[in-house]
């Protein structure tokens, strides 16, 4: 089983990734993947897509047909278009309701697996030391702060370890991002210098 130190660290990595990528992006990606599965919802999505193409095609045919010169043909196309449009709107409402239900399920699962797990770990392991500090290395007031609120003195509490992990992950992400931007700007500048020299 994963140690408490690593469990808290990976929970904070997951929280950081969700916050960085964005919950909406993750929800959309999961919805697309869900529609690839053989479910009734994916069948409804395919049917909605087919109806949309049919409505667009009938609308195009209606626009290309003169309502005065070819009224019978235009009226027949209009009836088909209206029927297809009603079916499309009904299917769209059904699919929207299914997507709303799916989004709520994903949001609940995402919260439970990230912030919910973090809160659970904080309460469940509130009296458990994450790790012990070497004796005599820190003054007693520092040991008290590191064990705050309920861990034994001379150890690091779950709450403090949560803060350390969140801060360390954010700082490391900033460092990696700035390094990547520096590398990108350095690799782009020789190419632009070479182009400028060729132009002269």
Swiss-Prot record:
Cytoplasmic-side segments: 25-110, 173-200
Coiled-coil intervals, chain numbering: 42-100
GO molecular function: protein-membrane adaptor activity
Keyword Coiled coil applies: yes
Signal sequence annotation: none
One GO BP: tail-anchored membrane protein insertion into ER membrane
InterPro entries cross-referenced by the UniProt entry: Get1 (IPR028945), Get1_fungi (IPR027538), Helix_hairpin_bin_sf (IPR029012)
Positions of transmembrane segments: 5-24, 111-131, 156-172
Membrane topology designation: Multi-pass membrane protein
Subunit field text: Interacts with get3.
Family according to the record: Belongs to the WRB/GET1 family.
Task of the protein: Required for the post-translational delivery of tail-anchored (TA) proteins to the endoplasmic reticulum. Acts as a membrane receptor for soluble get3, which recognizes and selectively binds the transmembrane domain of TA proteins in the cytosol.
Protein name: Protein get1
